[in-house]
Amino acid sequence: MHTHNHFKTPSDAEEVDDLDDEMVMGVIAEIEQEVLFESDSDDDGFGAEQLGAPPPDDDNDQISSSDDSFDPNAEDSDSDDSMQHEEQAQATSAKRRKDDDGPSGSNRDVETNFDLDLEDETDETVRAIIAAIKKPRSAPPEIKLEDFVTDISFHPERNIIALATIIGDVHLYEYANEGNKLIRTIEVHSKACRDVEFTEDGRNLLTCSKDKCVMVTDMETEKLKKLYETAHDDAINTLHVLNENLFATGDDAGTVKLWDLRTKQHVFELKQIDDQVTQLLSNEQNTLLLATSADGYLTTFNIPGRKLYVQSEPYEEELNCMGIYRGDSKLVVGTSKGKLYSYNWGSFGYHCDMYPGIKSPISLMIPITDRIACVAGEDGNIRACHITPYRNLGVVGQHNMPIEALDVNSTGELLASSSHNNDVRFWNVKYFEDFGDIKYNEKHNAYKEQRHNLPSSKCTNTGDFFADLAKQEDDEDDDAT
């Protein structure tokens, strides 16, 4: 999960909401079903009279009158002619219906009527649905894999995303709004690949695994470039790229190592943590290396001095993720209790502020801008929050299951997430560039903000629906006057 500090200025192009493919198919199916129902209702209009049979009431009247004047010796001279006319009428009606239906039956009628509805629909709700269906995509479609996705990483220069899986493979996809294309599947590890990262120049792909190895793959040749076999004594959980040559790794036992791609062995090793290292992070100058861990410590290492810088006071919760904000002046850490701890840069012994965050555990954090972060966890929602002062901005996107990985591309416009459902979804977060700075004394509704759906969300807000209705009524009143 690689963080980026470069953000692109928003263009003037019209932004559109992403529409879930399943939602589109569902809407089309409902419209087709409605049209089919109307077509069936029209077919029901072929009654007994159209088929040549007399109406039921007339039959009763005729029977009643014939009973009164019944003559057993009389001859029914019209009976044969009546039956013949009835058979001819039935055959003519059946032929007419067959010609109307054609070889495909009612499906042809549904198709024709649906096309007409697209052009001539007067119902405002249906027109809105059709307009939404015709909108172009603002983000690539979902990627679905057979295996569990453990981590994802965007290429820094190309439209490529790497997906690490639990069986040790890495899938390289070329993504676009029109569709995604699998470039290649690289079999790199014998056990679960836990972290995947590109170097800053994008030439190399680094992976670490439960098999205790670190692999370096050349992106140009797509072949193995270097193997650090048994890089740790324990399973490696996380990896962080500092630049095109340096990277750091942390394992399940708390050991942190710094590596240089130009050497065969690690540069230095430090063991100051007693539990799993959950994330590694460094500042832009690469002078400090920070590590969060499951034992509730924030540990900072001095890279040039190759020694411990400071270790925080213990917390009664797991520290899972972190990010740097406000011009490298603030460090924010997410915890297993859904809290966010803020530290002044350099003062990592104890937090200066604590934000309530969300009620569910926070396991992932990605800086989108210098003041906006996206956090995710077990509840399956990706939420945006403003840092210093803290504000919930709303829901960026959703998954049906807990979210496992999160990353943002180099421009800061596209966010990708994967869940326990083996799916990877994309969210266009370009709109964050237009968010203004939040003031400390600004009034806000915390309850509403936490449930507010942002433009990239696949859900809509109830208030938006009623606002559109009110606007429509105002427009109608203006037209009437």
From Swiss-Prot:
Write out the ranges of the repeats annotated as WD: 144-183, 188-227, 231-269, 272-311, 314-353, 398-437
Protein family membership = Belongs to the WD repeat WDR55 family.
The record's listing under Pfam families reads: WDR55
Which InterPro entries does this UniProt record tie to the protein? WD40/YVTN_repeat-like_dom_sf, WD40_repeat_CS, WD40_repeat_dom_sf, WD40_rpt, WDR55_POC1
Checking SUPFAM superfamilies in the record gives: WD40 repeat-like
Keywords in alphabetical order: Repeat, WD repeat
SMART domains given for it?
A: WD40
Protein name, as recorded:
WD repeat-containing protein 55 homolog
* Entry keyword annotation includes RNA-binding: no
Highest taxon of source: Eukaryota
